[in-house]
């Protein structure tokens, strides 16, 4: 399951723009994405691939709950802040994915995370989620063989995220990760969190009380072990804590198309034509091989 936007943003910033003339179209994100996919497919031999897509990068229903959600990334209107040279490549990326036999899958009013969450939930044969987004750690499930191939350090330095990884790094289980993120907040998504509660305190609360509902119940119990300072902060954040979990947790029951049952079947002629037209033939050859 590809978090496609996460990958093409990484490709755009990680692959040099080698245009030789000012009027040549930018292609570094597209070629970089193809090279990433070639490496992933070569090294992991997936039985099938789904390119999950942001049909709405900032769904209104999430904004209605937390107004600051991704607010700092809005360029104008409701469009995401994105370099023009990357924006120009989105149609090329879509066309290349279609040519590969991996057409993007998006659901109106939802993010790629929600598409990924749904496929990961309904899969019955193990799933690798390829992303640079920690939010998807909430999907990790050893029993169902769902793990994250975390690309924050680059595609050549993938971190394999399983339950032990999440526990060692954050002190919580994957099923507690979304609640920890709610308490801690996430500046990259515009989530304020609860003042005075960082990652370690959030993890400690969840270990003591199980989940966010357990923490909230403990806040109302004067005999619980929550310190007066933390109790006061949690009480003051009641409205946020009521709304944020729905924003942070990925949707897992979208009406997605049936997952492919085998490896992608590329349209070689289309891919070669794209490679020739945009000067990315080397990347096309690598992924076809």
Regions found by a protein language model. Name each.
Residues 45-50, 81, 143, 160-289:
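Non-catalytic nucleic-acid-binding/docking modules located in mid-to-C-terminal regions
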Residues 1-130, 134-156, 241-257, 261:
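Noncatalytic, basic helical substrate-engagement surface that gates or grips nucleic-acid strands
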């Amino acid at each position: 399951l590809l978090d496609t936007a996460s990958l093409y943003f990484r490709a755009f910033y990680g692959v040099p723009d080698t245009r030789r003339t000012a009027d040549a179209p930018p292609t570094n994100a597209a070629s970089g994405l193809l090279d990433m996919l070639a490496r992933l497919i070569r090294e992991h031999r997936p039985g099938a691939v789904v390119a999950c897509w942001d049909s709405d990068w900032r769904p209104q229903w999430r904004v209605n709950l937390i107004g600051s959600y991704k607010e700092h990334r809005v360029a104008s209107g409701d469009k995401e802040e994105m370099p023009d040279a990357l924006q120009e490549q989105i149609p090329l990326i879509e066309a290349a994915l279609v040519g590969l036999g991996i057409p993007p899958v998006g659901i109106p009013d939802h993010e790629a995370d929600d598409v990924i969450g749904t496929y990961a939930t309904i899969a019955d044969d193990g799933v690798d989620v390829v992303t640079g987004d920690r939010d998807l750690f909430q999907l990790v499930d050893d029993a169902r063989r769902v793990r994250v191939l975390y690309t924050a350090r680059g595609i050549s330095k993938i971190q394999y995220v399983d339950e032990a990884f999440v526990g060692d790094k954050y002190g919580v289980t994957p099923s507690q990760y979304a609640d920890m993120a709610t308490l801690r907040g996430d500046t990259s998504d515009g989530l304020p969190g609860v003042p005075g509660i960082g990652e370690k305190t959030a993890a400690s609360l969840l270990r003591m009380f199980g989940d966010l509902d357990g923490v909230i119940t403990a806040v109302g119990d004067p005999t619980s072990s929550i310190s007066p300072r933390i109790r006061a902060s949690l009480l003051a954040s009641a409205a946020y804590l009521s709304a944020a979990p729905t924003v942070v947790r990925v949707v897992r029951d979208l009406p997605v198309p049936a997952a492919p049952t085998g490896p992608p079947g590329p349209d070689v002629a289309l891919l070669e034509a794209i490679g020739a037209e945009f000067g990315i033939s080397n990347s096309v050859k690598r992924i076809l091989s």
